[in-house]
Amino acid sequence: MAITAIQQVLTLDYWKRADKVKIGDYVFNKDGEIVQVKLVQHYYANECYEVTFDDHLTIRGDKHLGFLIQDRNHRKQLDAYKNIRPFKRQLKFTKLENLIDLSLKDKRGRTKYSIPTTKPIAFPHQVLSIPPFVFGYWLYNKNKKHQMVTIPGYQDFIYEKFRSHGYKIIEGPKRKNGKRVFITEPAIHLQLAPNIPSRLPTNYLFASVEERIELLTGIMHAKSAQYEKRNDRFRFSSRNLNVVVQIQSLVESLGSKTSILFNPARNTYTLYFKFRIKIMDIQKSPPIKVYPSRRYIKAIEPTQPQMCVHIETNGPDNSILVGEGFIQTC
């Protein structure tokens, strides 16, 4: 396996360019587990390719770059097992050199090959100044006066979550739309002062799986109508693309695939995703799958020769997570 030198590799010390990864660094494998780098080789590759997926993400490497390839038969077997329990036919990494001469579409024009998304990434537990649920709710619900409002139907749940972390709820007036204003003691913005964040800090995005699920739960309860029961789909909207991209990274680190759409009439970006872990009581998602989701390969195209980096780990398959979407490669 070799990825191009400028590809970003997820490490325990945040993202690193592939050409900056060193022996002894800790990275993450296809199952989201921590593994250690034992070999790094730099070389110039004359035959390089760019792989494009159906969510417009790309990854570049030489012809030896490998993916866990799912074909139509494999996906049919997953459906037969209802995507809940594994079966005997295990996926193996397939190199690009074995794919570049194949058609990526079947006779009906449907995309043939897909790769599974990573499992939730096992970042270490963090010592966070504000509990994840409380922080996520506060960050995306507060007004300029640092007041919050309850969401109709979830007031008792929200109050209980805050109280379970030692916060006293002080209620204000109830609005005509059913929302009630409230503040907390201690005040969250005073706990964070003087550096009050306007976006998700890195230590929250790199917290443990349980902490990130709690963070996402708080964010999804912070506004009304963020879950579409009919489509079993969550959404998060903002006019700030950087904010949406942060939530996208949070969701994808938990194994889900996402998409972002722009509404020019409202000048708003909306993140859409499905999430198999239950974070809202009205959620009707099916059980967790063998693989949380999948990306379809839309194109494999030659690109210019360039420096590449071959990385081996002490894991059983040398898999690592690369780039946006935490794409698993080998």
List the predicted regions and their residue ranges.
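Intein-associated homing endonuclease modules of the LAGLIDADG/DOD-type, together
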Residues: 1, 23-32, 39-270, 295-330
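Protein maturation boundaries and topogenic segments
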Residues: 1-21
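Short, functionally important structural connectors and interaction interfaces within domains
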Residues: 10-13, 120-122, 292
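Polar, glycine-rich mid-to-C-terminal structural blocks
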Residues: 268-272, 277-280
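Surface-exposed, non-catalytic interaction/assembly patches
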Residues: 277-304
